[in-house]
């Protein structure tokens, strides 16, 4: 999960109450470990813009040293977090819920201890968390078939998304490894953009596992497991989209801090809130649209402006506290987006061997 706080995911959803306990990692009947929630007693997160907006005043200040370069997936640190676990903003729905914060903290700790190449432990989601998942599926079921792009709808059938259970990250990997070779890896919370984007270069998408607070199933102030699974994961199984998102990651390998900030905004306007042409219509492929009933309906209404993506131009600010998006950036196809971004990566000095569909995983 990139260190960007999502706006409200406006979903008309069912509520629910829950009793929280502590979590324990234990062996289940399956071959994968699972996480169980068992009993025990029980500073606002800072926005990414505040942390990584470049402050450099000279060219030498703005460059990234060789020691900072990320050269393999093993250099990508999923512990590079700007905010996670129980570190919730005061206006977060779970801020005054100690048990919820404790559960978030435990899930964060579990994510931080995960090692590349090892199975991801299952999380045993509570009945209230499952009810939240169910509510989101119910709301989106009427809009996604009409307004999601064809690649998303095709890939969605590959995953066991249904009411009654929250899918596990390791299940996602079983599908992704057999289709595009991608891997989902757990992360504790809001990940630093340099490390998050670099993970994409090596075909690794970092995902949270925590659920939004049950008191407001229609809203999450940051990406949660609902957003990650419904919004991001399905399209990672599409080769053309997978190449597009990997190209953003590849560009980051050659980027200095100022360019990382620019790429973060490119990511926002494509991977989070991008749309693609299908005939005389535009369809959603951005995860922030696909996982939000309200944003999806807003996109479909035609109320927002449509603009062509140009990664060479300064990108508008990322709107995450102003309600729905005022504009969406349009691609003619994922292949077109990959070509644009590959050209941008070349302008940063990325070696030709790492451009396009080159595998660096």
From Swiss-Prot:
**Per the similarity annotation, which family is this?**
Belongs to the biopterin-dependent aromatic amino acid hydroxylase family.
**Source organism superkingdom:** Eukaryota
SUPFAM superfamilies from the xrefs? Aromatic aminoacid monoxygenases, catalytic and oligomerization domains
The residues forming the transit peptide are: 1-55
At the top of the EC hierarchy, this enzyme's class is: oxidoreductase
Instruction: Assign the protein's first listed, main location to one coarse class.
Output: plastid
Q: Specify the protein name.
A: Phenylalanine 4-monooxygenase, chloroplastic
Q: Which reaction does it catalyse?
A: (6R)-L-erythro-5,6,7,8-tetrahydrobiopterin + L-phenylalanine + O2 = (4aS,6R)-4a-hydroxy-L-erythro-5,6,7,8-tetrahydrobiopterin + L-tyrosine
Which cellular compartments is it found in?
Plastid, Chloroplast
Summary of the function given for this chain in its UniProt record: Catalyzes the hydroxylation of L-phenylalanine to L-tyrosine. Can functionally complement an Escherichia coli tyrosine auxotroph.
Q: What Enzyme Commission number(s) appear in the record?
A: 1.14.16.1
Keywords in alphabetical order, please.
Allosteric enzyme, Chloroplast, Iron, Metal-binding, Monooxygenase, Oxidoreductase, Phenylalanine catabolism, Plastid, Transit peptide
**Listed Pfam families:** Biopterin_H (PF00351)
Q: Which GO terms describe its molecular function?
A: iron ion binding; phenylalanine 4-monooxygenase activity
| Provenance organism | Chlamydomonas reinhardtii
Q: Which GO terms describe its biological process?
A: L-phenylalanine catabolic process
Ranges of compositional bias, category Low complexity: 56-67
Cellular compartments per GO CC: chloroplast
Name the PROSITE patterns for this protein.
BH4_AAA_HYDROXYL_1, BH4_AAA_HYDROXYL_2
- Mind telling me which Gene3D superfamilies this protein's record contains? Aromatic amino acid hydroxylase
Instruction: For the region Disordered, give the residue spans.
Output: 47-67
So where does Fe cation get bound?
227, 232, 272
Give the protein's cofactors.
Fe(2+)
